[in-house]
Swiss-Prot record:
Gene Ontology terms describing biological process: tRNA threonylcarbamoyladenosine modification
Name of the protein this chain belongs to: tRNA N6-adenosine threonylcarbamoyltransferase
GO molecular function: iron ion binding; N(6)-L-threonylcarbamoyladenine synthase activity
Originating organism: Sorangium cellulosum (strain So ce56)
Cofactor(s) of this protein: Fe(2+)
Gene: tsaD
Length: 356
């Protein structure tokens, strides 16, 4: 089975052709980072307009690289939720038009489910029998990105087999990285810059600038708004740091965020009695997170599965794969499929403060 996946939920226009076994035949991503950088974040109207310009050429390139035509496809998958309404609508309209014209089945995919299953993608011609880097169900997954941060128990690929164990009460981890980077004058997107600077910093030298982020509390919930405010107060009092002081502050900030992500994910795996941990989402590309999660899992005898960088950030391949599994299960959507800004995965974490 060969499925085309289309992803336009935020600021990447992406399309890919993937088999139901997870083999990536093509994967094309057009980033909008340069368009949004002057604004310090994603502008929904700008995103939707650029998706409208890019989606058809990106889909054509994905089909061409895979060596297939629309007639060769077994189905078309598209991100239908969650995301920016206008951006989602562009991808949906493109997918619907192609599905109707080619007479192919259409399936909508929850963007978060795509991230949670991205670990199963095989890139670069890996042997079909090579399962060393693929987990078995169930596993505990940390999904951390610019819009979402949550820990899930994943018992299978279906929506009903995925359960949230804990999530952020306010900002997502990636959002915190971008906001702190903006405070420090590091530009957008901030995550990669902070990660690079943190590698040369001493977190202890700036420990007074950041709080501990609930890392030691038993709850599996996160809160990242406080650390942003703490850094803002630090900068307001002392000015924007430069040189080694900047690297130290980045190291302290990143260390606090990563410690919370790692400790709570490991705690969730042990509480669920599951020995497999998966990382997903754009923040999973952070080298500090990868290193600390690997060390923590090794100490506790947990098997860690981390997708390659191309599978962590938004991409069409994860949407195509999740869609292929839906198609293989006999599921279909109609041309009435509409965009939804919220995930279909049930939430257990309340936004805002207060005890659960």
């Amino acid at each position: 089975m060969r499925v085309l996946g289309i992803e336009t939920s935020c600021d990447e226009t992406a399309a890919a052709v993937v088999t139901e076994g997870g083999d990536v035949l093509s994967d094309v991503v057009r980033s909008q980072v340069a368009l949004h950088a002057p604004y310090g974040g994603v502008v929904p109207e700008v995103a939707a307009r650029d998706h409208a310009r890019a989606v058809v050429p990106v889909v054509r390139e994905a089909l061409s690289r895979a060596g297939v035509s629309a007639a060769d496809l077994d189905g078309i998958a598209v991100t239908s939720r969650p995301g920016l309404a206008g951006a989602l609508l562009v991808g949906l309209q493109a997918a619907k038009g192609l599905a109707w014209a080619a007479g192919k089945p259409l399936v909508g995919v929850d963007h978060l489910v795509g991230h949670l299953l991205a670990v199963f993608l095989r890139r670069g011609g890996a042997p079909l029998s090579d399962e060393r880097e693929r987990p078995s169900f169930p596993y505990v997954a940390l999904l951390a990105s610019g819009g979402h941060t949550a820990i899930y128990r994943v018992d299978g690929p279906a929506l009903g087999a995925i359960r949230e164990l804990g999530a952020t009460r306010d900002d997502a981890a990636g959002e915190a990285f971008d906001k702190v980077a903006k405070l420090l004058g590091l530009g957008y997107p901030g995550g990669p810059v902070v990660d690079r600077l943190a590698a040369g910093g001493d977190a202890a030298a700036a420990a007074d600038a950041v709080p501990a982020l609930m890392a030691r509390k038993e709850s599996l919930e996160f809160s990242f708004s406080g650390i942003k405010s703490s850094v803002a107060r630090h900068v307001a009092k002392r000015g924007r740091p430069e040189g080694q002081a900047l690297r130290d502050l980045c190291a302290a900030f990143q260390g606090a965020v990563v410690d919370a992500l790692v400790q709570k994910t490991v705690r969730a795996a042990r509480a669920e009695g599951i020995g497999r941990v998966v990382l997903g989402g754009g923040v999973a590309a952070n080298q500090g997170l990868r290193a600390k999660m690997a060390a923590a899992c090794e100490r506790r005898g947990l098997a860690l599965f981390v997708p390659p960088l191309a599978s962590c950030t938004d991409n069409g391949a994860m949407i195509a794969y999740a869609g292929a599994l839906r198609l293989a299960a006999g599921e279909r959507d109609t041309l009435d499929l509409a965009p939804e800004t919220r995930t279909a995965l049930p939430r257990v974490t309340r936004k805002g403060g207060g005890a659960r």
